[in-house]
């Protein structure tokens, strides 16, 4: 539960860290977390935003369920990543894929998630090693490569750009 992870982080860091939680369109979760985090000015609860890339750039550690899009975006950006509780099925496989390659830590226990965050924040070598594993295992230029393959497949240079 995200509520438990937030509490573990608050217990571990107190006011020494800013914790930003992005709830997307989940208004019920946002309201619940706002109520839980009253009195903790260093915990920011955010609803839907189009500024996810900026938040990722600013964060020291990203907690996320192991969905493909957020996980891949974090890996391409070299953001230290802790995968939390997956939705059964492909997210289990995503978490295992990332963790086996050193691209994330994977843990469903909130206390352990907080400990992993502390390790990543305090140990530059661990952050570097994870970012290096992410770099080795992702291709930031894959969209352009796909466009090139599409150009070859249609036998035309009329495909000038791809928007994703």
Predicted regions and their residues:
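A short alpha->beta transition loop at the rim of the catalytic pocket in nucleotide-sugar-dependent
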Residues: 59-60, 78-80
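Donor-nucleotide binding loops and adjacent catalytic segments primarily
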Residues: 1-58
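Short, glycine/polar-rich helix-capping loops at beta-to-alpha or helix-loop-helix junctions
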Residues: 29-33, 70, 89-95
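Acidic donor-binding loop of glycosyltransferase active sites
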Residues: 57-66
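Acidic, glycine-centered active-site loop in nucleotide-sugar glycosyltransferases
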Residues: 77-78, 93-103
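Short alpha-helical segment that forms part of, or immediately flanks, the ligand-binding pocket
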Residues: 53, 71-77, 96
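C-terminal "capping" alpha-helix adjacent to the active site of nucleotide-linked donor transferases
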Residues: 99-126
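C-terminal amphipathic helix plus adjacent low-complexity
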Residues: 124-164
């Amino acid at each position: 539960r995200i509520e438990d992870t937030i509490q573990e982080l608050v217990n571990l860091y107190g006011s020494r860290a800013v914790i930003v939680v992005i709830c997307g369109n989940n208004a019920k979760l946002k309201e619940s977390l706002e109520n839980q985090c009253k009195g903790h000015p260093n915990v920011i609860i955010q609803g839907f935003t189009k500024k996810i890339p900026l938040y990722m750039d600013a964060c020291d550690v990203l907690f996320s369920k192991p969905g493909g899009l957020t996980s891949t975006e974090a890996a391409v950006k070299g953001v230290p990543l802790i995968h939390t509780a997956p939705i059964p099925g492909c997210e289990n496989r995503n978490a295992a894929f990332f963790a086996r390659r050193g691209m994330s830590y994977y843990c469903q226990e909130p206390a352990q998630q907080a400990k992993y965050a502390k390790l990543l924040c305090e140990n530059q070598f661990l952050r570097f090693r994870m970012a290096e594993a992410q770099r080795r295992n992702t291709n930031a230029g894959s969209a352009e490569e796909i466009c090139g393959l599409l150009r070859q497949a249609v036998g035309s240079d009329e495909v000038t750009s791809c928007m994703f």
